[in-house]
Amino acid sequence: MPAPEHLGEFNDSLFPEPENLFDDYSGRCPAAAEQDMSLEKTFTEDWDLKLLTREEMLANPDNRLSKVYFRMPEEAQHKWDSVYAGRIAEYRSGRLKGQELVRWKYQQYMRDYLATVLSVDESIGRVLDYLEMTGELDNTIVVYTSDQGFFLGEHGWFDKRFMYEECQRMPLLVRY
């Protein structure tokens, strides 16, 4: 979930599509075609695409997205509403179909994902700045890592459940 200050940060960006965004999974085991992490089939309207209006979240406060939304300060909710209103309108226009819809979902995914990663980058920067300010940077080993990375549209996927090359790369930062 992007931090409020980064909501919409990449909304004007157009990201290159992976060559295999529309992979047909031919020549591989059935699991590749039957997986449950497809931008086309599995990407949810609420949690993944964030396509609920404030009114819809008020009507369904137990929805996972609603719970996150209503924990935000009011000013962040207003920013959220303005950033996602255009996305909701475009999706509900009914003009997005087939591969065009998958491409659109991919762009929304990348915009939100990179806005989220931007917050992680800034947080690491704050830790390093603090260590420098307190004179402890040269006395401290900083290690940041994570579990394996996400598929970023490769094979038409958005999660990280299979051991394919694309998601085996892991963030690793070491500062000493």
Residue ranges and their predicted role:
Residues 1-139, 143-176:
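Active-site-proximal cap/lid insertion segments
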